[in-house]
Swiss-Prot record:
Species for this entry: Bacillus cereus (strain ATCC 14579 / DSM 31 / CCUG 7414 / JCM 2152 / NBRC 15305 / NCIMB 9373 / NCTC 2599 / NRRL B-3711)
Domain of life: Bacteria
Reaction catalysed by this enzyme: DNA(n) + a 2'-deoxyribonucleoside 5'-triphosphate = DNA(n+1) + diphosphate
SMART domains: EXOIII, POLIIIAc
InterPro entries xrefs: DNA_pol3_alpha_NTPase_dom, DNA_pol3_finger, DNA_PolC-like_N_II, DNA_PolC-type_N_I, DnaE2/DnaE/PolC, DNAPol_HHH, DnaQ, Exonuclease_RNaseT/DNA_pol3
Protein name: DNA polymerase III PolC-type
Biological role stated in the UniProt entry: Required for replicative DNA synthesis. This DNA polymerase also exhibits 3' to 5' exonuclease activity.
């Protein structure tokens, strides 16, 4: 009986699901709202039984996953079982039938009932109907099976079923009846599908225009309930919000269900509405994401989604609120400091939306300044052109000094003889200007000893903050009777004399000294100074930090009470003594030598980076900016990419330098240093940035600034500084997202990084994109005129200094190779004439000329020539190359040996006299399928070739599409092919194609749930979905394309196109990558796809073993073709190898999915195999499409649409214009279907209705050239499997297999079958390694059943990594041993070169393998009679 779940039961269920690691999408879809009704623990039998309640019947896959995970998770505690109770008892016949195999597996019954497993029950209400042959069977079944079946289905969550039987009629008559009814069913289905397609087409053509009003109009004054206030079921509520998800679904009843998810940014809610009549449907379908709606209805607990949902009666489209920039035209601000999702895990709004918003507000320009990167530039460039907004390209970079001085006021004084005044100050804050000293202490050090002390409190005449009291231990009471600050400084000045001053972080302490001296009427001190912090960084660069307490611990110096001046001073004195000894030993004898190493080596690591803004004013500046970004990532990366000041000076041309945010050195100096110091620092910059006080409020929170009043004073002083230095002061927003309500996305992202992100140490300020009037309000404290100057006038002025900058080129820049056009033409014609004769057939010459005109005319010849060189090098080195993608559509590529696929129509050609015969009527699918035929003139066999593939599928209808030549090199050869590009072009002209890894939806879901848990929030599912969407797409890391090589022409350099970096900032990686995602520069630079693949490696090994040139292998061998429909040509039966085909281990045809396709289609020709390859790689091409057409007898395998090119070729043969045929092919392959007007053209040219319907279903299609190349490799490998079996298995196990069970393999078929059964019985419980092993064992069984066998691993004959043929057996390599990796395997082989092993001990010592491996080899008899230890001799 269904019970009402408590919150605790639901929460425990969610915890259980998380522990079981059930994917979040499955939980959300099927298990949300479920619970644990009870848990029954049987301690005696060590068993746990869970009674679980779930919303509805689960898919069988999910049921089995739950079962598997429960067993795995509690295997060490108890045996687990569970039963399901479903809240919604509705089920379909398909669901009942899906569970039938599980049911029959779990019931123990007599073998007489085994036939139950081979049939599926019919379902009638709660009755299951089973076919039986007679009354006796019926009685036995009801008596013995009915109850366990009912019990088992109840466990699955179904209602209790009754078992009924149906006695079959005469089998032959029954079969005829079935066939007749099946045929009628098929015809009805086809008719229904055609009618449905027609109906859908008619309905989809109706588009509703105008404001949408579903139901009644909702009055403007009706009370709106904020969504956050909806916490329970309500009878009638009205909400309004932004639509962020829309879905419409046609129900079986004929009604349409609309599902919306909307937000008012206080929360989100799902809204459901059912159509009332046909007139509703166009309006339902016209609701789109991005609209604002008002909805009225009842709020209910939805049992399906397990959440509060509004069932709407009325939905009205409304105009949503939006921020407007109210400033007059021409008086609008320019944002000069803005971050995009390319600021790693920090900003959330896509740059295209930000630029578009600037355009809507009438802003003339907008700057992009991500943290240290330029990766948003390409998207920003496109967005700027679209919105008519000037985009200013910049970076917020990390500036470091080339080296921070160790010594100031340098003097020629002997370090060993000097007297040092080591001092420390405790203060009310960090600012020498706004804060004051409360304690000043010092010691004099000479000859390694403390010779005098100075200590005094100072009265600040203000209460201390709690933070200062806690940090220093100094209280207000301790300062009440202290001397005045001026008095303390005067005494100290007299006491210190002209000795060398020493402090830990001297720039901070000296700031207070100099300001204190000035206020006391004293001169600024010119005493020499040593900074022990920088001295420590110089002497101990390997340490992560050099704080005083850290250094004291390292050098064993006592630090009694850190952050009390006198104790810190004494500790610093002893630290100085020890470090001076080290520095003198390094050869530094005088004070004025201490800075001699400044800026050398990794000095850039020792400074603390300051932010600065860099804006490119021209293309020259952009190139320099790319260099700065590149070198900061390549040469100066330490925790973050750093820009040394000297590097910026070198590449400053065309760049404006701004002071950036509160992390910039000018703002920090204004907070902490004397005005003259600030002026000196600010001289380096071109303009000064100020930000709204609320953007900087975290400084007050962190007590770096006393209050908002002081913060405004600092901003005002920055404005005055600009006036003093005649530098423009600009108001910037430090934008990280578009609207205020987007702040939550950033909070979640920052929170996900925990303590690693310093932003988690304070609340995040509001950093949305502000309008002009919002920004003017922020700076109103400056006065109206000054506010307008910094917000509008000066930002426009900076924008006016920026010229026309182009971060992305408009053209393709290919490498130039002298004579490439002629060489491409000559090479193509030379090869063509060598095959087809000096007088080329018209069809050949026309195709060559057509292609060469496009290739040479558009500057693509060099791309072909480079690809030719790469392939040629691989072929010379002994490795075949497979082509991918559509390059096989190009006959020029075939003639240049870039691909083996010949795209001409199927044909014969005589290898001697060159006579040819072409079949260009579509009657033959592939030249390889033509019957053998001899040349009548020469009486020698014709060569057969041609796959009938149009050139247009490669370079487009106009032949102007940039060639994308993908090549499959051997996996073991791929690194050599990559490095060969460096030989061809030079190391500075080839780069790996960069990639950018962003936050995926599933990861974002984890962030949102984590944030909710950390902040004790209960969030509705709809709100979770909104937050997840807002967090996706933000940059997490960078990487590299597995095979993409970007080539820069030698007349340009990479910085003309993109910055460069190491992948994932992995310093010292073998390859540098493009900084931009390679898609951004795809149309500007040549990208070579040099991919690694197993097939060429297998072919190379087979060639080495057999001596057979793979190119000479026939492609129509009858025995080879047979394996695609059965295993008989291998000399085994289906029963022997548990497989209905012979394609185990054949690339592209060995997977269960494709083997099932082969069983259903029984291909017999090469072209049909190409069809299978295309069908298996497409989306919605086979399942629910071609397979049904073949099953229904509508058409044959060769007639269905298998590859994209088939569409164009077929339609041309049917009479359609080639241009239209190409457009239809492109539309279908992209999943866009066939527009109505094109459908009419197809019908007018007798294209059958089933063909058109099939086109409409397709979402993605495979290129025929790719399929043909794959099949060619597969057929060659299959040839070895049929005719040179042991060679095939040796190559397969060496190259493709990863997991082995050498013990079972060596014992033969029975042992292998037992191991297969053992793994198979585990089902989903099987570990990933076991699943991988299962494939290997299937191959092993097949090999053994063909009469071959495995030996044990042999200590003296086994290879490290390759299976060795020995008669009719294979000797496994060492790395087939469990736990023995390739390096250890090589170590054994290397060790045995030095002579036989004396003992197991000797083997372990010489090979360095583990004792466990030795014991395993011994247990398998691999070590023979090798003794345990070396025998000792007495003489």
């Amino acid at each position: 009986m269904l019970m009402s779940l408590t919150n605790e039961q639901q929460e425990r269920f969610q915890i259980l699901l998380q522990q079981l690691q059930i994917p979040d999408d499955l939980i959300n879809q099927y298990l949300q709202g479920g619970g644990i009704e009870r848990l029954v623990i049987d301690k005696a039998n060590k068993s746990w039984h869970f009674d679980l309640q779930v919303p509805r019947i689960l898919p069988t896959e999910l049921y089995e996953l739950l079962e598997t995970k429960l067993k795995q998770s509690f295997s060490h505690i108890a045996r687990t079982t569970f039963a399901l109770e479903t809240e919604n008892k509705q089920f379909t016949e398909e669901e009942v039938r899906a569970y039938w195999p599980l049911c029959t597996e779990r019931i123990t019954f007599s073998p007489m009932f085994a036939y139950l497993k081979k049939q599926l029950p019919q379902v009638n209400g709660v009755k299951l109907l089973i076919n039986v042959n007679n009354e006796l069977e019926s009685t036995a079944l009801k008596k013995n099976v009915a109850k366990p079946v009912g019990d088992q289905y109840e466990v699955f969550g179904f209602p209790r079923f009754q078992l009924d039987t149906h006695i079959q009629q005469n089998t032959e008559e029954m079969q005829k009846f079935r066939e007749q009814t099946q045929q009628e069913d098929r015809e009805r289905v086809i008719q229904a599908m055609e009618e449905m397609a027609k109906k859908q087409a008619e309905e989809s053509s109706v588009v509703y225009e105008g404001p949408i009003t579903l139901g009644y109009l909702i009055k403007p004054d009706e009370e709106i309930t904020p969504m956050r206030e909806i916490q329970d079921e309500e009878r009638r509520k009205t909400v309004q919000g932004y639509v962020f998800h829309v879905e419409t679904k046609e129900l079986r009843s004929g009604r349409t269900l609309l599902t919306l998810k909307i937000t008012d940014y206080t929360d989100s809610i799902m809204i459901k509405m059912f159509s009332r009549d046909k007139e509703d449907i166009p309006m339902l379908q016209s609701l789109k994401k991005g609209m604002w709606v008002k909805a009225r209805g009842s709020v209910q607990n939805d049992t399906f989604v397990r959440d509060l949902v509004m069932i709407a009666n009325d939905i009205n489209e409304i105009t949503g609120p939006s921020r407007k920039d109210k400033a007059p035209e021409g008086e609008k601000r320019v944002e000069l400091h803005l971050h995009t999702p390319m600021s790693q895990m920090d900003a959330v709004t896509p740059v295209s939306k930000l630029v578009a918003q600037a355009g809507k507000w009438g802003h003339e320009a907008i700057a992009v300044t991500d943290h240290a990167v330029a990766q948003s530039f390409p998207e920003a460039y496109s967005a700027g052109k679209k919105a008519g907004v000037k985009v200013i390209y910049g970076v917020e970079a990390n500036l470091v000094n080339d080296g921070v001085p160790i010594a100031y006021n340098e003097a020629h004084r002997l370090l060993a003889e000097e007297t040092y005044v080591v001092f420390d100050v405790e203060t009310t804050g960090l600012s020498a200007v706004y804060d004051t000293v409360i304690e000043l202490a010092a010691v004099k050090v000479k000859g390694g000893e403390i010779i005098d002390r100075f200590e005094s409190f100072a009265n600040p005449h203000q209460p201390l903050s709690a933070t200062i009291i806690e940090l220093t231990g100094i209280t207000d009471d301790m300062l009440t009777d202290a001397p005045e600050v001026d008095e303390v400084f005067k005494k100290f000045e007299e006491w210190m004399g002209d000795h060398t001053l020493v402090a830990h972080n001297a720039s901070f302490d000296m700031g207070f000294i100099n300001v204190g001296f000035k206020k006391a009427g004293l001169e600024k001190t010119n005493n020499p100074v040593i900074d022990t912090l920088e001295l420590a960084r110089f002497l101990f660069p390997e340490m992560k930090n050099h704080r005083l307490n850290t250094m004291c611990k390292k050098l064993d110096i006592e630090l009694t009470q850190h952050h009390r001046a006198i104790y810190d001073t004494e500790a610093t004195g002893y630290l100085l003594v020890k470090m001076l000894k080290d520095v003198i030993e390094k050869g530094f004898e005088y004070h004025d030598q201490l800075n001699d190493s400044m800026g050398q080596g990794d000095a850039y690591k020792r400074g603390r980076p300051s932010h600065m803004t860099l804006l490119a004013t021209s293309d020259v500046g952009l190139k320099n900016l790319y260099k700065l970004v590149s070198y900061s990532h390549l040469n100066y990366f330490y925790r973050v990419p750093r820009v040394p000041r000297s590097l910026l000076k070198k590449y400053r041309e065309g760049i404006l330098v701004g002071t950036a945010c509160d992390k910039g050195e000018v703002f920090e100096a204004m907070m902490q240093k004397a005005p003259e110091e600030v002026e000196e620092i600010a001289q380096f910059y071109d303009y000064i940035e100020v930000m709204p006080p609320e953007v900087l409020r975290h400084l007050v929170e962190r007590e770096l600034v006393r209050d908002e009043g002081q913060l405004k004073t600092i901003i005002s002083n920055l404005v005055k500084l600009g006036e003093t230095l005649d530098k423009p002061v600009v108001a910037t927003g430090n934008v990280h997202y578009l609207d205020p309500e987007d702040a939550m996305y950033r909070k979640i992202l920052v929170s996900s990084q925990g303590g690693a992100n310093p932003l988690n140490r304070h609340s995040l300020p509001p950093v949305h994109f502000r309008t002009t009037d919002e920004m003017l309000e922020c700076f109103s404290f400056l006065g109206e005129d000054k506010a307008k100057e910094v917000v509008v006038t000066n930002t426009q002025k900076i924008a006016s200094l920026i010229g026309d900058v182009h971060p992305v080129k408009d053209d393709l820049y290919t490498p130039k190779i002298e004579g490439a056009d002629d060489e491409t033409r000559d090479m193509s014609y030379k090869m063509a004439r060598s095959i087809y004769g000096e007088e080329l057939p018209e069809i050949v010459e026309a195709r060559l000329e057509k292609e060469l005109k496009s290739i040479i005319g558009h500057g693509f010849a060099v791309i072909y020539l480079i690809s030719h060189k790469l392939v040629k090098k691989s072929l010379v080195d002994g490795y075949l190359v497979g082509s991918r993608g559509s390059v096989g559509s190009s006959f020029v590529a075939t003639m240049m040996e870039i691909t083996e696929v010949n795209p001409l129509p199927p044909h014969y050609v005589c290898p001697k006299c060159k006579q040819s015969e072409f079949f260009n009527d579509g009657s033959v699918g592939s030249g390889f399928d033509l019957p053998d035929k001899e040349c009548p003139a020469c009486n020698i066999p014709y060569v057969k070739d041609g796959h009938d593939i149009p050139f247009e599928t490669f370079l487009g209808f106009k032949g102007d599409k940039v060639p994308d030549i993908d090549l499959n090199f051997s996996g073991e050869y791929q690194p050599r092919a990559h490095n060969y590009t460096k030989v061809l072009f030079g190391e500075d002209y080839v780069y790996r194609a960069g990639t950018i890894g962003t936050v995926a939806e599933k990861t974002a879901y984890g962030y949102v749930k984590g944030y909710a848990n950390d902040h004790n929030l209960t969030i509705r599912n709809a709100e979770i979905d909104r937050l997840v969407a807002g967090c996706t797409g933000v940059k997490r890391t960078t990487g590299q394309h597995p095979g993409g090589i970007i080539v820069v022409p030698d007349y340009m350099d990479i910085f003309d196109f993109s910055p460069i970096q190491y992948p994932a900032d992995s310093i010292g990686a073998e390859w540098r990558t493009t900084h931009f995602d390679f898609h951004s520069i795809h149309d500007n630079l040549l990208k070579l796809d040099i991919l690694g693949h197993d097939d060429p490696t297998v072919i190379r090994m087979l060639q080495d073993l057999s001596g057979i040139d793979p190119k000479t292998i026939p492609t129509d061998d009858p025995e080879v073709m047979k394996i695609f429909s059965g295993p008989e040509s291998l000399g085994v039966t289906e029963e022997q190898i548990n497989c209905k085909t012979g394609t185990l281990g054949i690339p592209e045809f060995g997977t269960k999915f494709v083997r099932q396709m082969l069983e259903e289609t029984k291909p017999t020709t090469f072209s049909e195999l190409v069809q299978i390859s295309g069908l298996s790689h497409g989306t919605d091409v086979w399942l629910g499409n071609a397979n049904e057409l073949i099953y229904n007898g509508t058409c044959t395998l060769s007639e269905v649409i298998g590859c994209r090119d088939d569409i164009m070729v077929y339609l041309i043969y049917q009479g359609l214009d080639p241009s239209l045929a190409f457009k239809i092919m492109e539309s279908v392959r992209k999943g866009k279907g066939v527009p109505e007007e094109w459908e009419e053209d197809m019908k007018n040219n007798n294209v059958p209705g089933w063909y058109i319907d099939s086109c409409k279903k397709i979402k993605y299609m495979f290129p025929k050239a790719h399929a043909a190349a794959y099949v060619l490799m597969a057929v060659r490998i299959a040839y070895f499997k049929v005719h040179f079996a042991l060679l095939f298995y040796a190559a397969y196990f060496t190259v493709r297999a990863d997991d082995f069970d050498v013990e079972a393999m060596a014992k033969g078929s029975a042992s292998i079958r037992a191991r297969i059964d053992e793994i198979a019985q585990k089902g989903l419980d099987a570990a990933p390694k076991e699943k991988s092993l299962l494939t290997v064992l299937e191959m092993t069984l097949e090999m053994c059943e063909r009469g071959y066998s495995f030996q044990k691993v042999d200590l003296y004959r086994s290879h490290a990594t390759e299976f060795i043929i020995d008669g009719d057996t294979l000797i496994p390599p060492f790395n087939a041993v469990p736990g023995l990796g390739t390096n250890a395997a090589l170590s054994i082989v290397e060790a045995r070169k030095n002579g036989d092993f004396l003992s197991k001990e000797d083997l372990q010592q010489r090979s360095k393998v583990s004792k466990t491996i030795i014991e395993y080899l011994d247990s398998q008899g691999c070590l023979g009679d090798l003794p345990d230890q070396n025998q000792l001799s007495l003489f």
